Amino acid sequence: MCGIAGMIDWRAETPADTLRATCEAMIEAVRHRGPDAGEVWVEAAGGAALGQRRLAIIDLSPGGAQPMHSADRRYVITFNGEIYNYRDIRRELLAAGRPMRSESDTEVLLEACA
């Protein structure tokens, strides 16, 4: 099971480096939940940060790394779960012309919602 973290400064007053350092400390505290990788995403203008410690199960490639951006870069997700029918949904998305860059169920969820 992965470890996830997030924070929001509703007034967007926290500097980006502070957001990043705080979220990095949060995911470091749950390193044991995801030994494969750890990443942080920061949107300083919106006062938000997401982080994840990854336990790679479905897509073992770097393409499955999180936090993950949608193809149009509008959305970001960090997700801990498993979508059992993600291959079926992925085929539907591809048939509808949606770009897919990985074999990750997280990307399927993200692009289905984007």
Predicted regions mapped to residue ranges:
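N-terminus-centric sequence/structural signature that marks the extreme N-terminus
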Residues: 1-114
